[in-house]
């Protein structure tokens, strides 16, 4: 089996773009590394013990599951006409799988590379039967929930120059229409993942509640 370190180095070349401050933007690369590590941990949980899993292919797919994003973001910034404007999430998955194939040909055995591409294409597919695709989906969803999810949202709000009020109100709207309950119910394949997500949502809820209190000064004792 090939070593994962050279693949990580290739992924870094693909996933690191330029930030609005013209610095290296490692956001997507860091996300993909986290997803890779969580996917590996989930693949070893008791629920998945009977599944046949190619852990190397799973790790590579986790690294490249959003490989198209950096290129699409560059197109948005530099081109007046670009396909990214009309690309669906499904399109992005297929584009990412193509990029993985292009960049890893000769680095990963052909049959394993085909599996990597199929894992990427079938991720977040409710009808997926591929074990690795289920695990990748759960790991990716977990990275969008809890403290990491709050950090991702606040990062976006800061980059867009938006106020704390908007972040707090967006969270409150999600709570009002049961957004988290629906996600916990619908997006996870493994009960292990669902339990982790429940704990993460609870921690995020506590943080956002405190953020809202501090924003309004409600944590200051009455005289």
Predicted features and spans:
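Short alpha-helical hairpin
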Residues: 1-17, 67-68, 72
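Active-site flanking loop/helix segments enriched in acidic
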Residues: 8-36, 76-87, 188-192
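Alpha-helix C-capping/helix-to-loop hinge sites
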Residues: 18-22, 42-46, 70, 103, ...
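Active-site-proximal helix-loop elements at catalytic-domain edges
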Residues: 21-23, 98, 102-113
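Divalent metal-dependent phosphate-bond-processing catalytic cores, especially two-metal-ion Mg2+/Mn2+ enzymes
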Residues: 23-33, 37-52, 64, 125-223
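An active-site-proximal "capping" alpha-helix that borders the catalytic cofactor pocket
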Residues: 35-36, 40, 89-105
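Acidic/histidine metal-binding catalytic segments
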Residues: 47-60, 105-120, 132
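His-Asp-centered metal-binding catalytic motifs of divalent-metal-dependent phosphohydrolases/nucleases
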Residues: 53-81, 96, 117-126
């Amino acid at each position: 089996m090939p070593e994962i370190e050279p693949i990580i180095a290739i992924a870094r070349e693909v996933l690191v773009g330029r930030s609005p401050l013209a610095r290296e933007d490692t956001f997507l690369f860091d996300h993909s590394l986290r997803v890779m590590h969580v996917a590996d941990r989930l693949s070893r949980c008791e629920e998945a013990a009977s599944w046949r899993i190619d852990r190397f292919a799973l790790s590579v797919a986790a690294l490249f599951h959003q490989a198209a994003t950096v290129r699409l973001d560059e197109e948005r910034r530099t081109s007046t006409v670009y396909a990214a404007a009309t690309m669906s999430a499904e399109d992005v998955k297929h584009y990412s799988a193509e990029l993985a194939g292009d960049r890893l040909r000769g680095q990963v055995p052909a049959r394993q590379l085909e599996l990597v591409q199929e894992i990427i294409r079938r991720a977040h597919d409710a009808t997926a039967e591929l074990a690795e695709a289920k695990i990748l989906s759960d790991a990716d969803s977990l990275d969008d929930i809890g403290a990491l999810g709050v950090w991702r949202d606040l990062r976006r709000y800061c980059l867009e120059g938006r106020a704390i009020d908007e972040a707090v109100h967006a969270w409150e709207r999600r709570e009002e229409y049961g957004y988290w309950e629906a996600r916990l119910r619908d997006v996870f394949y493994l009960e292990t993942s669902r339990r982790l997500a429940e704990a993460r949502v609870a921690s995020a809820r506590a943080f956002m509640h405190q953020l809202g209190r501090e924003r309004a000064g409600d944590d200051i004792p009455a005289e």
